């Protein structure tokens, strides 16, 4: 966990104008995805001395990646001069498609592993993400999208 703490610390605090981690394109979403998958999947598995399941960690990483893109689309105006995100490089429409394709990949991954409950959840997630291009309400982002992350573990097995 210490390397991830260091990564987040150095991302947030710039010690030099020339070398700022946050200026590396797409790094924000990777940090968020890595930290969530590490904290929610890898650490509990390591602490419990169970057999490490890379599939759950991989699924969580991709899922958090896909769910984070709508937040980046919403924050495009705020991040414009500070942080380089996928929507700034590709535009909101292409970023949205990347998010949808990520969820679709997880759907097929779950289907391949006969996890029908996760398939159902990926379909529900895609449907919930559709309004993210138009809705800018804090309620939608705070309760609906973040709520998906809260109930996500129920469907991953």
Question: Residues of each region from the PLM?
Answer:
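Generic secondary-structure boundary signal with a strong preference for alpha-helix termini
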Residues: 40, 45-47, 84-87, 103
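Functional transmembrane core segments of multi-pass inner-membrane proteins
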Residues: 25, 29-70, 76
């Amino acid at each position: 966990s210490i390397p991830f703490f260091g990564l987040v610390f150095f991302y947030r605090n710039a010690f030099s104008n020339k070398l700022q981690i946050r200026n590396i394109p797409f790094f924000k979403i990777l940090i968020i995805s890595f930290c969530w998958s590490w904290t929610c999947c890898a650490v509990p598995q390591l602490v419990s001395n169970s057999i490490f399941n890379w599939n759950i960690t991989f699924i969580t990483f991709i899922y958090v990646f896909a769910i984070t893109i709508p937040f980046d689309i919403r924050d495009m105006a705020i991040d414009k001069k500070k942080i380089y995100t996928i929507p700034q490089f590709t535009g909101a429409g292409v970023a949205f498609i990347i998010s949808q394709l990520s969820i679709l990949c997880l759907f097929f991954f779950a289907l391949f592993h006969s996890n029908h409950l996760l398939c159902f959840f990926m379909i529900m997630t895609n449907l919930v993400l559709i309004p993210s291009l138009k809705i800018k309400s804090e309620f939608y982002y705070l309760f609906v999208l973040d709520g998906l992350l809260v109930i996500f573990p129920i469907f991953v097995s």
